[in-house]
Structures are given as structure tokens and as C-alpha cells.
Amino acid sequence: MSAKGGTIKDKWKMKKWYSIIAPKVFGEVSLGSTPAYDVTQTIGRRVETTLYDLTGDFSQVYVHLYFKIVSNEGDRLITRFVGHELSRDYLRSLIRRKSSKVNSVFDVTTKDGYVVRVKGLVLTTYKCHQSQKTAIRKIINETISKKASELTFDDFTQEVVFGRLANEIFEATKKIYPLRKAEIEKTKVLKVPENLGKQVESSSVSSG
């Protein structure tokens, strides 16, 4: 029994700790650390945190951020932002009886070639007609698509996670019907530029 326990401890001691670093768009702050026998074992791992953990602003605790470890620089694990999602509890808190919810899910391409699936959400103050929902959904799509085409992926990411794009949608759609809230409920990166993928493959070979 003790021999087995000793073996487990010995294996744990053989592991090395690596620091997980956020992308430049999030200030390259620490996302924590992870152990591994070899740095190549960490590549591809998914990391979850909240915007609150990065900014210290408790009002952003419901914004969940997802990153993927794509390469390393010595003991530092470099990540890429791969999406975000608002917490279910927060979304439930927005729902009201006798109001309408307008969702729109579609793919956009940023100025620098990232393909991102975006889920927009608008909540009206009262129940609205189907024609009004259609008009609201059209504006959601147009606003997000235009913003994505004009911005790099990093800039688009900031517009999304810090709520600025949602505010723009709110201002544009409130002209159709009284609104309570607009949000970018979820994003997911579907494709990165081909040249970036090749750079990642090259840099992840070295363990420093």
C-alpha cells in the first residue's frame, strides 16, 4: 500500500508546472498553472475563467471566457481565445413574463479572417408581434456582421465581451420596439486564419 502511494508521489514529483497566459487582447495576465510530464501534453487543453477573474470587476462575474493552449514559450503556455458564454443564472434572471425574447445565431468573419459563431439576444419590455421580431433579428445580424467585417478578431472580441457591441444593438433595435436588454449571449471561434495555424504548429514544437 505504502509502495503504491510512494509511486504516485514520485510520479507527481516528476511533473513540471507551467504558467497559463492569456492572449494579448486580455493583457497577457495569468490564467493559473497546470502540471505535466511534458509541455506537449498541455497543447490543446481548454481553460475556462470569468471576465471578473481578469479584471477584478465583480459586475462581470457572469461572463465566462474560454481559452485553448496552443503553444509554449519555455514554461509559459500561450493561449488563444476560443469563445465566451453568459452564465445560465444570469440569463434566467433577465427573463420576464409577458415579454419577448429574440435570438439570432449565425457566423461572421472578422477583418483578419477569423470565423466566429455568434448568438445575439434581445429582450423586449412587452410581447411584440412576429413582424417586429423579424425586424429586430435583422438589425442584430446586420449590426454584428458589419462590426466583425470592420474589426480585427482581437478588437471584435473586446467589443463582445465588454458589452459594447450589445449596447450598439440595443440602441439600434429600440427604435423598433421598447427593449429591456440586449446581449451577445455566446460566441465560438470556428476557424482561424490558415497562416496563424501554421505558426502555432511551428512554435509548439519547442519546449524551450
Curated annotation (Swiss-Prot):
It holds the Pfam family Ribosomal_S3Ae. Keywords: Ribonucleoprotein, Ribosomal protein. GO terms for biological process: translation. InterPro entries: Ribosomal_eS1, Ribosomal_eS1_arc. GO terms for molecular function: structural constituent of ribosome. GO terms for cellular component: ribonucleoprotein complex; ribosome. Belongs to the eukaryotic ribosomal protein eS1 family. NCBIfam families: PRK04057.1. This is Small ribosomal subunit protein eS1.
